[in-house]
Regions:
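Conserved ABC ATPase "signature" region
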Residues: 97, 101-104, 109-127
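Conserved ABC ATPase signature
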Residues: 131-135
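Conserved catalytic motifs of ABC-family nucleotide-binding domains
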Residues: 152
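Catalytic Walker B motif of ABC-type/P-loop ATPase nucleotide-binding domains
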Residues: 156-159
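Helical segment within the ABC ATPase nucleotide-binding domain
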Residues: 171-183
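Conserved small/polar residues in nucleotide/adenosyl-binding loops
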Residues: 187-193
Length: 193
């Protein structure tokens, strides 16, 4: 995975420094970034997933320069935000199929196979006909992971991975991350994660 961050700064228009001279080398594998609310974790995450521009500094993800190669980075990146949203009109299968189409899977047979395999991997195959917004909290989280992984990204970034999950679902979710992704960056304010 290798993420390299050099002299990264983010200063908001009001003058607040969200990030100041951040230098970090994130190796391949699981990596957690732990810190209290307001420490800049979410700002750093938004920059890494190309949702926010840094004020200055350099970021490389798998050899791609974030400022010059955003399209390439989006192609290798899976992202699961803390407050993942589902389209109420889609069933679980349809939602994941839509994500697969957006990721560039154009052949119906290839897409169906990828969606079926991913639903099986995350334990949602039996509820594929249920509307996504009617799933339990843990099931929604797993569907979010499936959506982030459907295009087989090299890197997955997860914000507050177990927020809102009961203890049993937390364990299942952590195990799922270990099973389906070799390269995972977790942002959390919960040391248990």
């Amino acid at each position: 995975m290798s993420i390299t961050i050099k002299n990264l700064n983010k200063i908001y228009p009001n003058g607040n420094h969200a990030l100041k001279d951040v230098n970090l080398e994130i190796p391949t594998g699981m990596f957690g970034l732990l810190g209290p609310n307001g420490a800049g974790k979410s700002t750093l995450m938004r920059i890494l997933v190309a949702l926010m521009e840094p004020t200055s500094g350099q970021v490389e993800i798998c050899g791609y320069d974030l400022m010059k190669q955003r399209k390439e980075i989006r192609g290798i990146l899976g992202y699961l935000p803390q407050d993942f949203r589902f389209f109420a009109k889609y069933k679980t299968y349809e939602f994941l199929d839509y994500a697969a189409r957006l990721s560039g899977m154009t052949q119906n047979r290839q897409r169906k196979q990828a969606v079926d395999e991913m639903l099986e991997n995350v334990g949602l195959f039996d509820v594929r006909e249920r509307y996504a917004n009617k799933l339990s909290g843990g099931m929604k989280r797993r569907l979010g992971i499936a959506q982030a992984l459907i295009h087989h990204p090299k890197v997955i970034i997860v914000d507050e991975p177990t927020t809102g999950l009961d203890p049993e679902e937390r364990i299942r979710f952590r195990n799922l991350l270990y099973e389906v992704s070799e390269n995972c960056l977790l942002y959390t304010s919960d040391a248990a994660d």
